[in-house]
Amino acid sequence: MMTIQEIYEYLSRFFTPVELIGNGEELIHAPAKIESAQAGEVTFVANKKYLRFLALTEASLVIVERSLAVEEYVGKHSFLKVNDPYSAFVFLLQRFIPPRRIAKQGIAATASIGSNVTIGENVSIGEYAVIGEHCSIGNNTVIAAHSVLLDHVTIGSDVVLFPHVTCYDGTRIGNRVVIHSGAVIGADGFGFAPQQDGSYIKIPQIGIVEIGDDVEIGANTTIDRATLGSTVIESGVKLDNLVQVAHNCRIGAHTVIAAQAGVSGSTTLGNHCIVGGQVGFAGHIEVSDHIQVAAKAGVSKSFMQSGIALRGYPAQPMREQLKYEAQLRTVGDLHAKLKALEQELKALRGSEMPLQNTL
């Protein structure tokens, strides 16, 4: 639990300015949604459509935007005013969430540890985990039950691998990385050479996967090893569940990709991109920095202009695609008008036929 004054002081370490309105001595024991928050709980408003809940919520503390007028609610709630209430609430959540128990402290008796493995301080390795030969694991890292590291895997400090994560040989993972259950890092890329008889032979995939610092990888996401060189996930990248990153791709720093998106081989995404769910990228293309791609778009060519938004299939800049979609909605009316004109034209031609026959 924290008093409102303590919350104010904590958030002031990360946000400037922070303004407290109300009773700083009241105790807060949990965060909650504004729709259901009760006395003793803290919530936030970052979206105007939730402002109506200020009159209804029972929350003791509400974090709001600095420009919001809250005078009519003072007395019922206390307020913390910040420039970014959403981010402030996220920082506060980090203080309230209890630590997860992912694996027991230490190395489980059933874990299999290969030869020439370097293990840092305060490392936990769960039941039936398998660590191959010549692996390196940094300090404070947790490898949960049934996870597998093949040979020559390097993992940094403060990394968390949830149960059933698989890292193929040679994978390199930075610091403070979180990988959720079912993820497979470093499986062979989809490379097959067609033969004259119509068959295929497998192209050896002898590269690796490199993952930077502060990356989070969702459940059942797969990142394939490079054919040659590296598939690279740069620092700060966030991948949702069920994302496929093919061989030799590069995902730029702090790019986020939502579920069921797929990036084909040798494609590069820039820094700070936002990719919606079920987006598909063709292979061997490049997308610049700060690009947003709407859900279900199909990106079939390179876009090198930074900061644009893409939409549709094939994807094109948002303004062009919206114009096209607006025109597409009129096709039904245009079709009906065209049919009517055809009928009129037939009628006119029919009335002229007897005259033509007398010539």
Swiss-Prot record:
PROSITE patterns: HEXAPEP_TRANSFERASES (PS00101). It comes from the Bacteria. One of its GO terms (biological process) is lipid A biosynthetic process. Keywords: Acyltransferase, Lipid A biosynthesis, Lipid biosynthesis, Lipid metabolism, Repeat, Transferase. One of its GO terms (molecular function) is N-acyltransferase activity. It catalyses: a UDP-3-O-[(3R)-3-hydroxyacyl]-alpha-D-glucosamine + a (3R)-hydroxyacyl-[ACP] = a UDP-2-N,3-O-bis[(3R)-3-hydroxyacyl]-alpha-D-glucosamine + holo-[ACP] + H(+). Its EC number is 2.3.1.191. Pathway: Bacterial outer membrane biogenesis; LPS lipid A biosynthesis. GO terms for cellular component: membrane. The active site is at 247 (proton acceptor). Pfam families: Hexapep (PF00132), Hexapep_2 (PF14602), LpxD (PF04613). Belongs to the transferase hexapeptide repeat family. LpxD subfamily. Catalyzes the N-acylation of UDP-3-O-acylglucosamine using 3-hydroxyacyl-ACP as the acyl donor. Is involved in the biosynthesis of lipid A, a phosphorylated glycolipid that anchors the lipopolysaccharide to the outer membrane of the cell. Homotrimer. This is UDP-3-O-acylglucosamine N-acyltransferase.
